[in-house]
Amino acid sequence: MAEILCMGEPMLEFNQLPPGPDGRRLYLEGHGGDTSNAAIAAARSGADVAMLTALGQDAAGESFRALWQMEGVDTALVRTDPDAPTGIYFVTHDARGHHFTFDRKGSAASRLRAADLPEEALRGAGVLHLSG
């Protein structure tokens, strides 16, 4: 059992960059989601940490799995939902600050239900980190 179990929705981020010379909007791809960020930070600090979530069977889901494995986050409790995408969001910037637009309705993580949660893993975790 992991010392720290992080449960929440990872989302692929597209963060707006300054316009290019031709005026087009450009976006930098990244990984977002409070629980994913916390899991990575804990793993980098030497903690035994696992993610509990669902990802789509898509490039974004594969990207998160690769990131967590590279960072030392246990992915044994990460489900793949072949019928739903991994959530994404966009960050845009203007004179009033930055603004978020989420596209997560029907995402793999949003479809998790109580019956999908492994009770033994939840009971065995020293810390359960949630976001929502």
PLM ranges: what are they?
Residues M1-V73, L112-A114:
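Glycine-rich phosphate/adenosyl-contacting loop at the front of the ribokinase-like
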